């Protein structure tokens, strides 16, 4: 028998997986540190303050997430962010060694930079794979 004990609130979440996908939806935390050695990272409708996402082999996909500061690192795999908020004021640095960078459906070759006018930031570094950012 299972009994509901109410909501669980966590201000910080640190998660490391060796093999397997990570799917999180509706997460609301101040600090997220997520590392996946082999497997995809999928976040949907999450509210995050400071976040670090690291995938060795696997895709990273964020949909309708909000954040103040996010750093994403990928060795092999695509990174796709579809944000529900306007990031034009954010400091943004995107770069890939092998692959394409697209921002709002505009091809940017292998890198993109926006200085922004706020303290909010997004940094994505990818060794092999595409980066797509839509806001």
Where are these regions (language model features)?
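Single conserved hydrophobic/aromatic residue that forms the stacking wall/gate
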Residues: 1-9
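Short, surface-exposed interaction patches in beta-rich subdomains
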Residues: 25-27, 31-33, 41-135
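Internal active-site segments that recognize and position negatively charged phosphoryl groups
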Residues: 20
């Amino acid at each position: 028998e299972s009994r509901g004990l109410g909501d669980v609130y966590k201000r910080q979440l640190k998660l490391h997986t060796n093999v397997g996908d990570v799917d999180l939806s509706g997460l609301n935390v101040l600090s997220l540190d997520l590392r996946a050695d082999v497997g995809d990272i999928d976040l949907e409708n999450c509210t995050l303050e400071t976040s670090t996402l690291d995938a060795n082999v696997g895709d990273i996909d964020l949909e309708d997430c909000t954040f103040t500061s996010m750093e994403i690192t990928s060795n092999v795999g695509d990174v796709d962010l579809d944000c529900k908020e306007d990031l034009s004021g954010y400091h943004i640095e995107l770069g890939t060694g092998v692959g394409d960078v697209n921002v709002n459906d505009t091809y940017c070759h292998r890198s993109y930079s926006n200085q922004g006018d706020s303290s909010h930031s997004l940094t994505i570094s990818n060794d092999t794979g595409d980066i797509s950012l839509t806001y």
